[in-house]
């Protein structure tokens, strides 16, 4: 069975990581059609053994098609592949029409929250044979926003990790190391982690924070740390190609975004016995079990209030999914005070939370199960289209 992967490889986030891992473990014949003009530098070593075709380039040259022709060329290139299924990875491509002789399947990794409800978006979701969702939240966002006539198939993220065998303990009960890892952009709400650290220090709790990742808000986050007198307690360590050292140095993982379809970094932390503090929004309650291996917090801090406290923008003018009410709602962030209280609760029961994190991870790190479920969902769509 042949799969054509339609993907933009300019960035390097969760979807791209999953894509690379899938290619290494796939049982299908795979072809890659890249819609960006170049690869992200972090992807080059990972993809050097794969043949990548570029949607905007003429044959194997560096010459690009004129912009007005690209949607026609893309449609033709998809058809020329003669793939059983064309899998669109987490973006809305510009197509001239529905490609013939292939099932068109969209794989959502969280971008469906952010697509503007334009004609381009609605036409694309209308021409799909089906979609694959990363979580129940992702499935419901597509159904609620785009009124899909098909029911997206849920295949949760499972990472190829081996959970730790031994739970972590706090070697120094008086000192706690917090960690967060993501792109340093508005919607990740990293300012909350810094304000939370400030709250803990006010409560005479010895804490420090390690922030992994790079992004456009790094300078502003460093200024926020200075403004709140916590600069000496924070390490900005930048992008890490190997996260093992980061996870080995932290005791509690902080996930403070305004939206998160299914947190991969949270899954990685739990597999290492690290409890997670997270907002009860979108797919996070599916990734982490509340009061068991982490603590979920109801977001109560409005975006304008966050801006007042941090001088940081969220840049997320969309709604988020509330799993309790099964509705789309205005985005908010968790309050630094609630975050600090939850950290104290975890500290007081640390050994139990850590062991539970490892136990919970046995399901979320069963990568063979992910491959089976993912390929079953793809195969099902091929059967639907060609029956």
Regions inferred by a protein language model and the residue ranges of each:
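A charged, aromatic-enriched C-terminal amphipathic alpha-helix characteristic of glycosyltransferases
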Residues: 321-341, 345-379
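Short hydrophobic beta-strand element within catalytic cores of glycosyltransferases
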Residues: 34, 275-278, 288, 295-296
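Short His-centered aromatic/hydrophobic patch
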Residues: 70, 86-93, 108
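N-terminal strand-loop element at the rim of the active site
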Residues: 5-13, 17-65
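Aromatic "clamp/platform" in nucleotide-sugar-dependent glycosyltransferases that forms part
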Residues: 239, 258
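Conserved donor-binding/catalytic core segment of Leloir-type glycosyltransferases
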Residues: 4, 132, 170-188, 194-197, ...
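A conserved mid-protein helix/loop that constitutes part of the nucleotide-sugar donor-binding site
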Residues: 13-21, 183-199, 216-222
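A short, active-site helix/loop in glycosyltransferases that binds the activated sugar's phosphate group
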Residues: 128-152
């Amino acid at each position: 069975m042949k799969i054509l992967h339609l993907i933009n490889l300019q960035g390097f986030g969760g979807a791209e990581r999953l894509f690379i891992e899938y290619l290494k473990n796939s049982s299908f014949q795979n072809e890659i059609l890249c819609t960006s003009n170049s690869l992200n530098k972090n992807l080059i070593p990972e993809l050097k053994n794969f043949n990548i075709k570029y949607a905007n380039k003429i044959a194997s040259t560096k010459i690009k098609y004129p912009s007005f022709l690209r949607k026609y060329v893309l449609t033709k290139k998809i058809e020329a592949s003669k793939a059983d299924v064309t899998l669109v990875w987490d973006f809305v491509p510009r197509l001239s029409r529905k490609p013939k002789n292939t099932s068109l399947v969209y794989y959502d990794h969280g971008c469906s929250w952010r697509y503007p409800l334009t004609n381009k978006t609605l036409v694309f979701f209308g021409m799909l044979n089906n979609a694959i969702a990363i979580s129940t939240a992702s499935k419901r966002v597509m159904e609620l926003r785009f009124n899909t006539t098909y029911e997206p198939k849920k295949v949760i993220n499972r990472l190829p990790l081996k959970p730790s065998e031994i739970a972590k303990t706090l070697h120094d009960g008086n000192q706690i190391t917090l960690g967060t890892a993501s792109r340093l952009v508005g919607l990740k709400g990293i300012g909350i982690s810094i304000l939370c650290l400030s709250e803990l220090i006010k409560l005479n709790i010895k804490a420090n924070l390690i922030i992994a990742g790079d992004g456009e808000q790094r300078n502003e986050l460093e200024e926020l740390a200075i403004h709140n007198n916590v600069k000496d307690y924070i390490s900005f360590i930048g992008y890490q190609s190997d996260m093992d050292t980061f996870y080995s140095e932290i005791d509690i993982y902080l996930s403070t975004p305004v939206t998160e379809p299914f947190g991969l970094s949270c899954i990685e932390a739990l597999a290492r016995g690290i409890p997670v503090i997270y907002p009860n929004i979108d797919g996070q309650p599916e990734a982490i079990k509340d009061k068991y291996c982490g603590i979920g917090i109801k977001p109560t801090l409005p975006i304008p209030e966050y801006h007042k406290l941090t001088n940081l923008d969220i840049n997320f003018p969309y709604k988020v999914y509330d799993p309790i009410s099964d509705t789309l709602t205005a985005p908010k962030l968790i309050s630094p005070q609630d975050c600090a209280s939850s950290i104290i609760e975890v500290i007081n029961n640390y050994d139990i939370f850590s062991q539970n994190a490892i136990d919970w991870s046995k399901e979320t790190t069963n990568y063979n199960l992910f491959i089976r479920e993912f390929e079953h969902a793809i195969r099902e769509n091929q059967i639907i289209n060609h029956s």
